[in-house]
Amino acid sequence: MSLPEALELAASRAAGLRPVDGLLPHITGEDGRWELLSPLDAEDAALTGLPWTGGFVAGQLWLAGRHERAAAVTEVLAPRAGQPTTHDLGFLFWPSAVLGHLATGEPGYRELALRAAASLAERALPSGVIQVIGGLDDPEWRGRSIVDTWPNLMLLWWAEREGLAEAGRAARAHLAATLDAFLRPDGSTFHAGRFADDGTVLERGTVNGFAADSTWARGQAWAVHGLASASRATGDSELRAAAERAARWFLDQLPADGVPPWDFDAPAGPKDASAGAIVASALLDLGHEDEALRLLETLVATCLNRSEGDGLLLHCCYRHPVGLGLDCATVWGDFFLLDALVHAVEPATRPDPLREGARARAPSQPA
């Protein structure tokens, strides 16, 4: 299947997404159908944060030009914007409210996204670290951060351009506090860390990876995407070099079939194609078109869902250490694949939070 054909399929699949009684698609279950979550309730008993994936449902619909359904999903998410409870406000409101504003020009989406950005900036600690989840005065969570926060900063970079100066300050401070702690000299990454209020690194390890010192594939992908966005937003040559180093490490570690494993240091286990989609999107933003297209072509050839089941990008892995979603489709994998396909095939239609005047029209799609 060619990339234009894959884009057509992706837009068609995205068009079927919708909220069901306030619940949103998340990952597919063993039956190949979407499992639904409320974006307003805890995902499971072990997670003190709230579900982080709903924005990617809205984002797919905006990218596919299905504005009515995208608006419905964004409305479901809206109560979260004023709740400074998680670093995932970026994932919730960059693909939903920011892309909604870019797609429609509606000022309400801009206001919603700015409210979410202000809430996210409130999670900054004296060290500059944006705490992942938990109350800022909760000793269990104080100072904890994960590399997944870096791509969440997209919301803050956009908000800075919209005049919210504290958003840019928070994003820069977080990167200054965490960059050297998470990015190893060879370009690989730690997933998680904990920081004292003075910035001292107290511990490093993982939440979703194979081992404390392993490189979790999606964490590496989040690093590539977050650093690519940061370098574009700031023009900082050191951040650009860091993004390039992380991307090169990721590409150099890919197995012969070109599909990322769930963890680059795990002796065996499932794939995580979503990590490949995230990196493909970032590579296009970095201007590495040839490498991005090779990665996209591999994912389309080996992981694209051509059956009647739900989801687009198969062979993704959600939370391996707890046995959740070991071989599934995910709404984030589908979002980043669709985003990369739009960027590669019809770049003029892609809404880009970091490009001036980035209003978009819907990609070509069947009637």
Q: What is the predicted role of each segment?
A:
Residues 1-367:
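Glycan-recognition and catalytic cores of secretory/periplasmic carbohydrate-active enzymes
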